[in-house]
């Protein structure tokens, strides 16, 4: 049982102003596995004051000092590898291999990349007799989601530290343990007091007062569009800078020259990875009408190989949905797909056979889907695919872009020129050709209702900076 009833503020673990706590549930067992403090506005006030008090000192720290700090974090992060893996498997229900190879590793990648970025990042530039300088924006509020407990926190923290901006972090109350471990790491390596502050709690008690606090100059949020809109509204009252990474309904375009077995394997991975709880999940699979029969046969075969089950059992690829509430949401979308006339091709409502305990969902494929159906337009956040056919490339691109979202897109095929054309045509912030994979120095963020701003690498650092021009500096 993990019980974290204190907040980390100004370099110390202190009692929360509130005596209330939030229970953390293991979604694979439905058991309470710990609790965290349910913070309030007084906790936020203390954290913001601590960050504000150190702001000028941290802003004026040297690049060398900040790089050394990031390098120390990297080494201690590695020392806590097993703790991080165990925490994520317990709180998120991610299979152990996924916790290690994706969750743990992505967090590490962001701290390493922020350090590398500082080697060449230009904080100052001369233009004639003028100086253009980039300065840390100031106290930054970070609000992170439950689906990637280390990735989303690490990428924001690494960028803020590299920029010289102190932070107040509010992690998701559903997966808070990984953030506590990060706080322990920062404490161990000597992150200066006030530079990092952790306030656990819910959106109403912590997220809202953080977004509205007049001394917070930047809000960085990852999560739902609904919550992002609220944060933006609250932050706008005193014109805070806002960076938002929101939802997606990403298209995966399968070209007509593709190997269908290869394409089926690739698209399956993009649907079921992290139990479909991925903002970039490629759940709208667009296939040529001429390849439909062969592709669907291969897709069903790939889905049938996916092992759903105990995240601690060897060979498990897909764990549970995060909560009963989210499980019910996924089920309601499956029901909606059937109701609107999509054909259930694989999976369906309910839990996989033999998995009565835990919030396990059946990986599901809908075919004969129209792009205007609810399941093709709304983010489900579960392992549910919508297969849509197209007759020509222009139609495929039109369907791909017929969405309010624009976070990611995928294309698989053989002809390089066609692949590049499709990649350039999809209206989204991140496109992947032939399963190219993640690259931590590439910018990440969305078009349209998928967000504002960019994260990862030097682009992420830019979000935590203000730009100042000084005319006559060199005259």
UniProtKB/Swiss-Prot annotation:
It is an enzyme of class 1 (oxidoreductase). InterPro entries: Ald_DH/histidinol_DH, Ald_DH_C, Ald_DH_CS_CYS, Ald_DH_CS_GLU, Ald_DH_N, Aldehyde_DH_dom. It holds the Pfam family Aldedh. It comes from the Bacteria. SUPFAM superfamilies: ALDH-like. The active site is at 245, 279. The keyword Nuclease does not apply. It catalyses: an aldehyde + NAD(+) + H2O = a carboxylate + NADH + 2 H(+). NAD(+) binds at residues 201-207. One of its GO terms (molecular function) is aldehyde dehydrogenase (NAD+) activity. The keyword Oxidoreductase applies. Its EC number is 1.2.1.3. Keywords: NAD, Oxidoreductase. Belongs to the aldehyde dehydrogenase family. This is Putative aldehyde dehydrogenase SH0913. It comes from Staphylococcus haemolyticus (strain JCSC1435). The lineage of its organism: Bacteria, Bacillati, Bacillota, Bacilli, Bacillales.
């Amino acid at each position: 049982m993990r019980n974290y009833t204190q907040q980390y503020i100004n370099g110390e673990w202190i009692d929360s102003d509130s005596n209330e706590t939030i229970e953390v549930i293991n979604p694979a067992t439905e058991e309470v596995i710990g609790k965290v403090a349910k913070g309030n506005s007084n906790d936020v006030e203390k954290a913001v004051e601590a960050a504000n008090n150190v702001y000028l000192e941290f802003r004026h720290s040297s690049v060398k000092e900040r790089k050394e700090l990031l390098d120390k974090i990297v080494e201690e992060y590695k020392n806590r590898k097993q703790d991080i893996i165990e925490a994520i498997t317990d709180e998120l229900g991610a299979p152990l291999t996924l916790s290690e190879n994706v969750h743990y590793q992505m967090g590490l990648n962001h701290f390493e990349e922020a350090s590398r970025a500082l080697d060449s990042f230009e904080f100052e530039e001369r233009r004639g007799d003028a100086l253009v300088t980039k300065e840390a924006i100031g106290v930054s509020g970070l609000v992170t989601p439950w689906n990637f407990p280390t990735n989303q926190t690490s990428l924001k923290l690494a960028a803020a530290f590299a920029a010289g901006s102190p932070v107040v972090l509010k992690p998701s109350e559903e997966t808070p343990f990984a953030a506590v471990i990060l706080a322990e790491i920062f404490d161990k390596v000597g992150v200066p007091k006030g530079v990092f502050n952790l306030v656990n709690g819910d959106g109403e008690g912590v997220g809202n007062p953080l977004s509205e606090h007049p001394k917070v100059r930047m809000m960085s949020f990852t999560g739902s569009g609904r919550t992002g809109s609220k944060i933006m509204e609250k932050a706008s009252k005193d014109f805070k800078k806002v960076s938002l990474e929101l939802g997606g309904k990403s298209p995966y375009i399968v070209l007509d020259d593709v190997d269908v077995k290869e394409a089926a394997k690739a698209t399956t991975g993009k649907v079921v990875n992290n139990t479909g709880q991925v903002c970039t999940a490629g759940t709208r699979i667009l296939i040529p009408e001429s390849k439909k029969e062969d592709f669907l046969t291969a897709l069903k075969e790939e889905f049938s190989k996916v092992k759903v089950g105990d995240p601690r059992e060897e060979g498990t690829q897909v764990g549970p949905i995060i909560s009963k509430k989210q499980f019910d949401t996924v089920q309601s979308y499956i029901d909606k797909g059937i109701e609107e006339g999509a054909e259930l091709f694989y999976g369906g409502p309910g839990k996989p056979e033999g998995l009565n305990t835990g919030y396990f969902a059946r990986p599901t494929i809908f075919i004969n889907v129209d792009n205007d159906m609810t399941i093709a337009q709304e983010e489900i956040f579960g392992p549910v695919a919508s297969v849509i056919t197209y007759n020509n490339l222009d139609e495929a691109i039109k369907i791909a872009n017929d969405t309010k979202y624009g976070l990611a897109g995928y294309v698989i095929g053989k002809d390089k020129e066609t692949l590049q054309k499709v990649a350039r045509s999809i209206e989204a912030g991140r496109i992947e050709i032939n399963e190219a994979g993640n690259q931590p120095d590439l910018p990440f963020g969305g078009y349209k209702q998928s967000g504002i701003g960019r994260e990862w690498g030097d682009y992420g650092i830019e979000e935590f900076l203000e730009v100042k021009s000084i005319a006559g500096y060199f005259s």
